[in-house]
A protein has these predicted regions:
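N-terminal active-site wall of soluble small-molecule enzyme domains
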Residues: 76-129
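Conserved small/polar residues in nucleotide/adenosyl-binding loops
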Residues: 215-222
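Conserved N-terminal beta1-alpha1 strand-loop-helix module at the mouth
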Residues: 9-74, 85-89
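Active-site beta-loop-alpha junctions enriched in small/polar residues
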Residues: 36-40, 77-79, 109-113, 141, ...
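Conserved anion-binding
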Residues: 114-124, 128-209
Length: 227
């Protein structure tokens, strides 16, 4: 029963993600609170390093973010490490966030073949899913078009996605800044092609779209990587 939604809640959940996020940012500012129950954080805060500790820590962070942040982002692996108990803990935390009306992003960085990623829509975007979230993060390195199905499912359910384009980890630069040798964006960086694909999904939207990017602004000497 934990995942049940009223008709009013379901109507609100189906509204456009980009619009809801934009409205939340206008009300609370641009802050998105990352909820990442690392082992050391749990220890420092006096919680057990287990699924219950991760849940209690996350609930405390939710209470602090409520009414102060535009959204919260959960690091999926920090719950997955505890197996089924950790997933159940994340389900309860997501439910609590929905009850508070906080926009939720699950940072799962999923990706794969279209037949694989289509399952993610059932996990995160269906109205009665226990892991229902407002948005998830995706990896596009099977080809950005491999994500078309899950993106369309997200949009059809009023959800959003964040696609990794230009990330902060230095190890990613060799791939993300590589120059495409063929295809629609030949001569451009991989990051540019990903961003352009996302833009196509948002075409025609007024204001913020629902297909977003994970993008770290490059230093002045590295600005060419996004071109």
């Amino acid at each position: 029963m934990m995942s049940s939604l009223s008709s009013e809640e379901m109507s609100a959940q189906r509204s456009d993600f980009g619009l809801r996020l934009s409205n939340s940012m206008a009300q609370y500012g641009p802050l998105c609170v990352g909820i990442d129950p690392h082992r050391q954080l749990l220890t420092d805060w006096g919680y057990n390093v287990d699924a219950l500790g991760a849940e209690l820590y996350s609930m405390r962070m939710l209470q602090a973010a409520n009414g102060r942040a535009a959204a919260v982002k959960f690091q999926f692996s920090m719950f997955e490490r505890y197996g089924s108990k950790g997933i159940a803990a994340l389900e309860r935390v997501l439910y609590a966030a929905r009850q508070m009306g906080i926009i939720t992003i699950v940072d799962c960085l999923h990706g794969g073949l279209p037949t694989t990623v289509s399952a993610f829509a059932d996990v995160y975007f269906k109205p009665r899913s226990p892991l229902l979230a407002d948005a998830i993060t995706l990896l596009p390195y099977y080809g950005a078009r491999s994500l078309g199905g899950v993106i369309n499912d997200a949009l059809n359910n009023g959800r959003g996605v964040f696609i990794a384009s230009l990330t902060s980890n230095q190890e990613g630069a060799s791939l993300q800044t590589a120059i495409r040798q063929a295809g629609e964006y030949k001569g451009r960086t991989v990051a540019y092609g990903i961003a352009s694909t996302a833009q196509k999904f948002n075409k025609g939207n007024d204001g913020m779209g629902s297909v977003c990017l994970l993008y770290t602004s490059p230093s002045p000497r590295d600005r060419s990587v996004s071109r």
